[in-house]
């Protein structure tokens, strides 16, 4: 298990650097004479028409609805593996990261609502600071190399996976609108087919892919966010075949480099380009960016620490072996790295609002995530021993 985690983190570390490059490039283009080219590229109409099926969207929505569905497929595969065989497969293992994740979602949302309560438009962004970017958070931790105990890495990984599961539920419950009955019926039939394949022990990925594509189109047309199709597909792919092989893990390993080095950087490039030329101090301290930034910088670590402490004191959970509160605290700060996940929720929360709100949300996410990354990294670096453990 330790080798698998180290391989995972080494990939995430390189991916984290690529994410930073993508964000910097997006900000540069959005605030330079290339701004028109950048916006025009993302607004390029892309149409797919097969018979009566017609999907017509700008490029940025193909990225957010299509590529991110593949990312959520990967997240779903990771969640399923951890639930059945990994860090979440027993109550004892799952208790602490579960309580930590719940606190890390509730408190940031509460902080955001403190600044935005009463405004029906901005209130929609309450879930933005509740997210943790698993790739970026693990990438920052990986920069400290062998100084980080494996048990601490597993804690962050488990916490982030539960956080992702929470985000999936939030998207399904709060960011799905104008539901189409016909599309939902088709989606239900596709899900029934996927479950049937699983029950029959089918291990070939091709039929899952065909039904999965039908499911994605149906969910896209239904009003439920299309990324949820990826999670459903993942949960239906068998973890273990009769011969002991793992179709699920095989697909997970194949998707990881695509997610780390293509999907997430492309998403970051498409969504992080915030034009700041028309912003002033009053804009920067407006409720949306302040609520998000403080939710990530303060709400996340406070929520993670308080809920973890209560769970341990009530003997509902226990700290990982060899790990104390002084190591948990900087990891809690790292959970405030919302980055791509927070930006994704922002794109849903303010999809039909003035584009200014989306810009403010992305700006708050960038500020909060960068501060959380810096504080978490230097704090953890200070409390860890200088030599490998």
From Swiss-Prot:
It is a multi-pass membrane protein. NCBIfam families: NhaA (TIGR00773), PRK09560.1 (NF007111), PRK09561.1 (NF007112). The keyword Disulfide bond does not apply. The keyword Transport applies. Belongs to the NhaA Na(+)/H(+) (TC 2.A.33) antiporter family. PANTHER family: NA(+)_H(+) ANTIPORTER NHAA, SODIUM ION/PROTON ANTIPORTER NHAA-RELATED. InterPro entries: Na/H_antiporter_dom_sf, NhaA. It catalyses: Na(+)(in) + 2 H(+)(out) = Na(+)(out) + 2 H(+)(in). GO terms for cellular component: plasma membrane. This is Na(+)/H(+) antiporter NhaA. Keywords: Antiport, Cell inner membrane, Cell membrane, Ion transport, Membrane, Sodium, Sodium transport, Transmembrane, Transmembrane helix, Transport. The chain crosses the membrane at residues 14-34, 59-79, 95-115, 124-144, 154-174, 177-197, 213-233, 257-277, 292-312, 328-348, 363-383. It is found in: Cell inner membrane. GO terms for molecular function: sodium:proton antiporter activity.
